[in-house]
Amino acid sequence: MAKTDDREMTYRPLGRCGTKVSVFGLGGWTTFGGSVRNRAAVRGIIRAAFEAGINFYDIADVYADGEAERAMGAILRAFPRHKLVISSKLYFPCSGDINDRGLSRKHIRESVERSLKRIGTDYLDIYFCHRFDKETPLEETVRAMDDLVHQ
């Protein structure tokens, strides 16, 4: 368990990729829920989390219909990007479009691009599949995710 600076936060390896994440993270669902209400309060929460040494911030495209990604991204831009580990997720529909759901290659590529724009970053450190997609072959999902890693 590595510590950094003179903070009390503990960091652990994220798998075997070399990245370390704080043992505590800040999640978009608990922060924003189904809507983005009081941005000033959320800004204070995120600032306090960052100052406490939390470096892991998790969000999803579906939270508050994309507004949670926009709000968290706008707040996180106040901090050095290299000190953040940002994740998002996909699976659930964010529109009425028939292909805006699941884990198909098409949806993965389009969803990550929209998330990057909403969050206001060039890359995500982690991109999660929010759940298993029984309609898409696992091989297609894995290949599409691997393509993202190699971009």
Regions found by a protein language model. Give the residues of each.
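N-terminal small/glycine-rich loop or linker at the start of catalytic domains
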Residues: 16-34, 87-100, 123, 128
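Glycine/proline-rich, positively charged
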Residues: 95-151
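N-terminal binding-site loop/beta-alpha segment at the start of enzyme catalytic domains
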Residues: 1-84, 150
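Active-site loop signature of alpha/beta-hydrolase-fold enzymes
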Residues: 62-65, 93, 134
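N-terminal, well-ordered alpha-helical segments
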Residues: 44-47, 70-74, 88, 106, ...
